[in-house]
Regions:
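Acidic/histidine-enriched active-site and ligand-binding environments that engage anionic O-linkages
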Residues: 182-194
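Glycine-rich phosphate-binding loop of ATP-grasp-fold ATP-dependent ligases
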Residues: 34, 165-169, 192-212
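ATP-binding N-terminal substructure of ATP-dependent carboxylate-amine bond-forming enzymes
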Residues: 2-142, 146-152, 156-159, 171-183
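Residue-level signal for beta-strand positions within conserved beta-sheet cores that form or flank
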Residues: 16, 48-50, 163, 191, ...
Length: 212
């Protein structure tokens, strides 16, 4: 290449580090999975290139700027860290922290949402970040919302001719007809059948049914 490893290091040393806010946790059934993913991300982000701001979201939706050890994420001990500072993402202000009665804006170049499931992968966080004018990693609002709902995603694929596996569904309002719908699905798909919630993450609530 043009530069030796040492030369590249010198180039990075004089460039401004990118400020990355990493969101983890979330008000979701996949809160624990997010904490594990964020642990991996935080352990592997190159701190010579990036200034990292971990932002944890509790299961009940409280946001905190977190400065404690990364290893406390998986256990959930991060929530009890004495240095946690209440935070939020606000349209017009970006990422803000509330400390000692003062609201201060934190400069952020990009947000990395390491969130899983509802309120993380379904377009909600993405919409908030767009309203706040913050660039972010991952799919946009529409792609996130469509792909989070497996029924909508399958219907979009059907309408556009994208190949996919055979499927069937039951809407919430059809619950009284569960037995009839299950028989229809068995006739259409054959056994075994994999059953899962339409709008949860890929690993949540899935089961393998071999008979009625």
């Amino acid at each position: 290449g043009l530069y030796s490893t040492a030369a590249r290091g010198k180039v990075w040393s004089v460039l401004k580090k990118l400020k990355v806010a990493v969101l983890f946790g979330g008000a979701s059934s996949e809160h624990e999975v997010s904490r594990m993913s964020a642990t991996s991300v935080l352990n592997n982000l190159d701190t010579e290139k990036y200034d990292v701001l971990p932002v944890g979201i509790t299961k009940d939706g409280r946001w905190y700027l977190y400065s404690g050890p990364v290893e406390d994420l998986c256990s959930g001990a991060w929530e009890r860290h004495s240095g946690n500072v209440p935070a939020a993402i606000c349209p017009g202000s970006g990422l803000v922290a509330f400390e000692n009665g003062v609201c201060r804006s934190l400069p952020v170049d990009v947000v990395f949402p390491v969130l899983h499931g509802k309120n993380g992968e379904d377009g909600t966080i993405q919409g908030l970040l767009e309203l706040a004018g913050l660039p972010y990693v991952g799919c946009g609002v529409l792609g996130s919302a469509v792909c989070m709902d497996k029924i909508i995603a399958n219907r979009v694929m059907d309408a556009t001719g994208i190949p996919r596996c055979e499927w069937d569904c039951m809407e919430r309002w059809q619950r009284p007809e569960l037995a009839a719908i299950a028989r229809r699905a068995a006739e259409k798909l054959g056994w075994p059948i994999f059953v899962k919630p339409a709008n949860a993450g890929s690993s949540v609530g899935i089961s393998k049914a071999r008979d009625m």
